[in-house]
């Protein structure tokens, strides 16, 4: 290792333990716009790939309980899109991730915001430090094609190289696709498939996910679909997935014995929106999205009764690193 590197240091070996002290050092180092040593980045990503490979495509999550049986809470966040300083603010407001204060991040950690590397790396570090403290689901931006166009690949190659980018792609291919909290709330990045015969918890849990999402089918619908206000379905304006009506949400929840659908994937002015007769929530956690939307961010906290409570927040100041700084010239 170059003697000039004075940043946070991990132990030696293939899988050195990641401590909370190391994470706090890294968070502070990133806030100063400094670059974590490549050796550690590779060690961390290799650990992450092995960890995510070992979990199901559908996570079954429980609210934490203390030794007396008292039930705690769960925090669900939406898109963060490389807005690292706003992610740090989420942890200032909601508390750091821990088994007693668990978080679920619902995809789209990267792209558009130009501090995407630091954003996703911080989430991965919390995940590896204690798997019960933080959970990550795949979004449509945790994919090779999107990363090529919307900035993450350009950012990683600017800060590191293609080898590191290839490792991120391998990690993203192993991320789970959906979660059920307390047998009650279904969380997914995009939305529902309108192929109702395929849209079951059993089918989701058996998806062979270690790949780029195909152009159509259940996996891509989960990542890309959006709710619409009127019943029925339409091909999505995005070109992938569908728009699904309240009838699809009601049918899916009833068929699978669930109460609520939580999804992200769309910026909302207040940081969240409740629709489909209260059965579908969109949560979005990147305030003043791309430095221009003026929206609030929000997260959801679920307590024992599993009723959603919302916390809204505004964007915090950040260094002058413009969004889309590393995006593909194909966009211009």
Show the residue positions of the predicted features.
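Feature recognizes metal-dependent phosphohydrolase scaffolds
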Residues: 1-332
């Amino acid at each position: 290792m170059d003697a000039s590197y004075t940043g946070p240091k991990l132990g030696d070996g293939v899988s050195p333990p990641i401590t909370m002290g190391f994470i706090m050092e890294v968070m502070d180092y990133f806030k100063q716009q400094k670059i974590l040593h490549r050796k550690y980045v590779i060690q961390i990503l290799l650990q992450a790939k092995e960890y995510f490979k070992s979990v199901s495509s559908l996570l079954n999550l429980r609210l934490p309980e203390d030794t007396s049986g008292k039930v705690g809470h769960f925090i669900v966040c939406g898109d963060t899109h490389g807005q690292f300083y706003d992610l740090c603010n989420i942890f200032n407001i909601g508390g750091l991730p821990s088994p007693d204060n668990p978080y679920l991040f619902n995809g789209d950690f990267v792209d558009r915001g130009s501090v995407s590397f630091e954003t996703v790396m911080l989430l991965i570090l919390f995940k590896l430090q204690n798997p019960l403290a933080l959970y990550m689901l795949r979004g449509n931006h945790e994919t090779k094609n999107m990363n090529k166009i919307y900035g993450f690949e350009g950012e990683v190659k600017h800060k590191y190289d293609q080898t590191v980018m290839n490792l991120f792609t391998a990690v993203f291919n192993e991320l789970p696709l959906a979660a059920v909290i307390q047998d009650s709330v279904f969380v997914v990045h995009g939305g529902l498939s309108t192929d109702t015969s395929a849209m079951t918890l059993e089918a989701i849990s058996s998806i062979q996910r270690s790949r780029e999402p195909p152009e159509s089918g259940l996996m891509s619908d989960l990542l890309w679909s959006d709710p619409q206000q009127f019943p029925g379905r339409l091909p999505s304006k995005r070109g992938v997935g569908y728009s699904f009506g309240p009838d699809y949400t009601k049918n899916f929840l009833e068929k699978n014995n669930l109460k609520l659908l939580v999804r992200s994937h769309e910026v909302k002015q207040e940081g969240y929106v409740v629709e489909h007769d209260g059965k579908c929530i969109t949560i979005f956690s990147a305030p003043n999205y791309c430095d221009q939307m003026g929206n609030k961010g929000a997260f959801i906290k679920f307590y024992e009764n599993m009723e959603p409570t919302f916390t809204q927040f505004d964007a915090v100041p950040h260094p002058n690193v413009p969004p889309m700084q590393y995006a593909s010239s194909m966009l211009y």
